[in-house]
């Protein structure tokens, strides 16, 4: 949906990677909360990047999905599980928060609404 991502583009940034599937109920709940609370807060921060990756989905599938859901953040396809096969081979949703030095500072599996506040506090801390 938004091209490719180069690791050079992510250097020095706080990066949130979220792996989801359109058929996954908890993923739908999590992405709705991301759209409502997280994305509006961080979308304009030049030191933050969010990669929402659709496991086993094509660009066309994600475009159609986004039309139905109305998300304003980019969705990235991974139809052959080249990325998601390494980081979320089984359970989703899965999220990784990476600090400006490229270190994973948080990793979660599944979704609970109360975890969103914790994640946002971790993002705030990493952005300082």
What are these regions (language model features)?
Residues 13-15, 20-23, 91:
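Short pre-active-site segment immediately N-terminal to redox-active cysteine/selenocysteine motifs
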Residues 13-14, 29-53, 67:
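Conserved helix-turn-beta segment immediately C-terminal to the redox Cys motif
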Residues 6, 20, 51:
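Conserved Rossmann-like nucleotide-binding pocket used by diverse enzymes
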Residues 46-59, 71-80:
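Thiol-based oxidoreductase modules, predominantly thioredoxin-like and allied folds used
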Residues 64-71, 78-124:
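Thiol/disulfide oxidoreductase modules built on the thioredoxin-like
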Residues 1-15:
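A short beta-strand-turn-helix
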Residues 21-26, 56-60, 81-83:
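Solvent-exposed loop/turn segments at secondary-structure junctions
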